[in-house]
Amino acid sequence: MSILCTDFFAFDFELMFSKSCQYAIRAVLYLADKGKDGQCVGVKEIAETLEVPGPFLAKLLQQLSRNHIIGSTKGPHGGFCMTSAHLQASLIRVIECIDGPEVFSSCVLGLPACNAANPCPLHYQSLAYKQGMLKILKDKTIAEVAQQVPEIV
């Protein structure tokens, strides 16, 4: 059984992305492994495997499905899945769907008034980092990232 190594997310993702976004990324990568080729995986299985709250994860997966990042099927054998088209989408789509496109333009210290005219102490140092992360996440497909995530358990 594949479960996503939390070290993959340890520094960069926890610093930049909400817990909701982290759950969504982990779920999408799980689906890339278990729900590819249209094979449906239920919320309960995903939630138990990733050790995340089921009802909360269900809402995130529905949001991803409404935005065509993953597929879904209703009914007794329903669940969530990924087609080859879903797998070729860039990982940034998941992040923008859950945390919004402004995640890379917001202040790393969370200061609302931080901008080029009124920078926080980390504004310019974090700019290159954020731009680099944005490029990586735009360039990497869900399939590429899923293949690089180590299997444990």
Residue map of PLM features:
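C-terminal regulatory/oligomerization modules of transcriptional regulators
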Residues: 3-12, 105-153
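N-terminal helix-turn-helix DNA-binding core of bacterial DNA-binding proteins
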Residues: 19-52, 71
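Short, hydrophobic-biased segments on the C-terminal half of alpha helices
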Residues: 28, 61-62
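Alpha-helical residues within the helix-turn-helix
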Residues: 48, 65-66
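Key DNA-contact positions within bacterial/archaeal DNA-binding proteins
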Residues: 55
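Beta-hairpin "wing" of winged helix-turn-helix
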Residues: 67-82
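Charged, amphipathic alpha-helical coiled-coil/dimerization segments
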Residues: 79-99, 103
